[in-house]
From Swiss-Prot:
Matches recorded under Gene3D superfamilies: TolB, C-terminal domain (2.120.10.30)
Name this polypeptide is given: Uncharacterized protein YBR053C
Family membership noted in the UniProt record: Belongs to the SMP-30/CGR1 family.
Note: Present with 4190 molecules/cell in log phase SD medium.
GO molecular function, one term: calcium ion binding
Highest taxon listed in the record's lineage: Eukaryota
Length: 358
């Protein structure tokens, strides 16, 4: 359904990083929390949860927590799952919790990790699983063991966490990934989309709060699912054929959705396109490419984005994610960019993810 006609190209080759954590490998899942002014993101490969409490002063307000077996809660209600190969923890996506948050500080988050949905308490410096993916009836134990969390989001009513799983780093990439729907209150997990390679960003249409937009990275496709019916999906955007034909694998990765408050626009999707240094803006009505933001060529692995008011924050990944021996030649990948004034007009600050019921 997508089309490529006239579109605007915005060259940002001289843009400097907003912030770069030393040693960052795969920054992802960037999220803004309006209530506390907090910017959150993860490093998937290193299994880290990062936060900046003062966006204007990231150097002085940045902190992070490394998820590992060693700091798993001693009194956790769920025992740490069997891990005979001692696979590393990873963190694919993050969901803020406002319960107990002060005016300017997030104290707890939920997150998609290696074996399930975890909960981190920054004040206690420990974490625990609140539900395991192996509890999903449709997932065998062996299959669940080979998977890890990728991207995810919270349904408009807050009831469900939708999280995509894909092959974990030590394993070959296979179509054993899936999309799960997690109900934390009922302690229930359902498999709602099977046999995926890399499920990615998930959004809902603001008009009906039901229609879903789901990213299928290695099919280079954004699917539109009217009424939230994942079985009745229509191709909305063909990313590979949206001015990306010159790239070997221009995979749509994380994205940000925006709906105007004046009713003049039906909505736009801003997609980070892995391996291209691009963020592309599409019209949700017809899948038409409207703009391209071309980031510095030193960081082709753009991975996710979110809005803070008018500004778009973009995460990137390092060139050496899966390398057994790191040469540390990539000094740029893993940084975060801030593209100013991407949106026009009076744009209020809004949180980019809902708090899930838990």
């Amino acid at each position: 359904m997508s089309s490529v006609g006239d579109f605007e190209e915005i060259i940002l080759h001289d843009l400097k990083p907003y912030y770069h954590v030393p040693g960052a490998i795969h920054s992802e899942g960037i999220t803004f929390v309006k209530e506390t002014g907090t910017l959150l993101w993860v490093d998937i490969f290193k299994g880290e949860v990062h936060k900046v409490e003062d966006i204007e002063q990231p150097e002085s307000s940045h902190s992070f927590f490394s998820i590992s077996r060693a700091n798993y809660g001693k009194n956790a209600s769920i025992e740490y799952p069997p891990n005979p190969d001692e696979l590393k923890e990873s963190v694919g996506c993050i969901f803020p919790i406002l319960d107990g948050a002060s005016q300017n500080e997030i104290k707890q988050v939920l997150f998609g990790s290696k074996f399930g949905i975890g909960k981190l308490d920054f004040s206690k410096s420990e974490w625990e699983y609140v539900i395991l993916y192996s509890e999903c009836p449709e997932l065998s134990t062996d299959r669940a063991y080979k998977l890890r969390s990728n991207d995810g989001n919270v349904s408009p009513d807050g009831k469900y966490i939708y999280v995509g799983l894909m092959s974990d780093f030590p394993f070959d990439l296979e179509p054993i990934g899936c999309l799960l729907r997690v109900d934390l209150l009922a302690h229930k997990i359902e498999l709602v989309w099977n046999c995926l390679l890399i499920p990615n960003a998930i959004h809902w249409d603001e008009s009906d709060q039901k229609t879903m937009y789901v990213t299928d990275s290695l099919n280079f496709t954004i699917w539109k699912c009217p009424g939230g019916d994942l079985l009745k999906r229509d191709e909305l955007i063909d990313v590979k054929n949206s001015n990306n034909q010159s790239f070997e694998s221009p995979e749509p990765d994380g994205s940000a959705i925006w709906f105007s408050k004046d009713g003049k626009h039906s909505g736009f999707l801003f997609i980070t396109v892995w391996s291209t240094s691009k963020v592309q803006m599409f019209d949700l009505t017809n899948g038409k490419l409207l703009k391209e933001f071309i980031l510095p060529e030193q960081t082709p692995r753009v991975s996710c984005c979110c809005f803070v008011g008018k500004d778009l924050f973009v995460t990137t990944a390092n060139a050496e994610i899966n390398d057994a021996v790191r040469t540390n030649t990539d000094k740029n990948g893993g940084c975060i960019y801030k593209i100013p004034n991407v949106l026009d007009g009076n744009v209020p600050l809004e949180s980019t993810k809902r708090q899930p019921l838990h």
